[in-house]
A protein has these predicted regions:
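Compact nucleic-acid interaction/catalytic patches
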Residues: 14-19, 25-55
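C-terminal terminal-subdomain/extension
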Residues: 56-103
């Protein structure tokens, strides 16, 4: 499941609702998954990873994985699978995660 991209009902940070958007599965937890948000707004924060192979991943436009927007979600919130990250993008996500999650 790691690196698969889904359309998902992703909640707003203020819990006022949700928006259907692409997400990347980071961890499979059985009925749940840890996911991060994907945005088409190109940004370059310390927790952002540019998805270089965005067409291969099933995305409609250049996109960024936002590793600072992570939640645990029920898989029932997944609407459809869009694709999977290319191996180079998977490695970039792992590297950025490891660089920023050192305790």
């Amino acid at each position: 499941m790691f690196g698969e991209i889904y359309l998902c009902r992703f909640p707003f940070t203020d819990s006022s609702g949700s928006k259907i958007r692409p997400v990347i599965a980071l961890f499979d937890l059985g009925q749940d998954a840890v996911i991060c948000r994907v945005t088409g707004r190109l940004r370059s924060g310390r927790m952002d990873v540019m998805i270089n192979e965005w067409k291969t991943a099933g995305l409609l436009k250049p996109s960024v994985a936002m590793l600072d927007r992570i939640i645990t979600a029920e898989k029932s919130l997944f609407i459809s699978k869009l694709g999977s990250l290319a191996s180079s993008d998977l490695e970039a996500v792992k590297l950025r995660w490891n660089q920023n999650m050192v305790l």
